[in-house]
Amino acid sequence: MRLKPVYATDPNLVDAPLTEVPNQWAPQQGIHLYHFPLSLDSQKVRQGLEELGVQWQSHPILLSAHQQFSPSYVRINSRCVVPTLIIDGKVTTDTINILDLLVARFGTTNKCFETSEEETELVNYWIDKAAGLFIEAL
């Protein structure tokens, strides 16, 4: 399981994604997703949660109203981006990071996630390549 995208070289960097980091300001029980309904990355995580049959609570963050900069959200995700997944008070950020965590934690109970080890490695290779692209250079 990949828990750190290729661009995160120092876990202390603000830009580094979080993986199950305890947070006193986050909801301490249950599974919570902070997301923007029209965000493609948020849609990917919602789809993953549904495909895996995970029960979760929705916390819409309205980007047009700048809710991602509210003090309560910044305490949870200092990058001020969506989506953010919280499981029992532990924060995970970055779409691919979240999906990797969900598959590892909740198993592959759905055919969408069933693959051979070779197929999984190939998919992970291309996901890492895409995550490492410097979009502004394109």
PLM features: residue spans?
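GST-like domain detector, emphasizing the conserved glutathione-binding G-site
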Residues: M1-L138
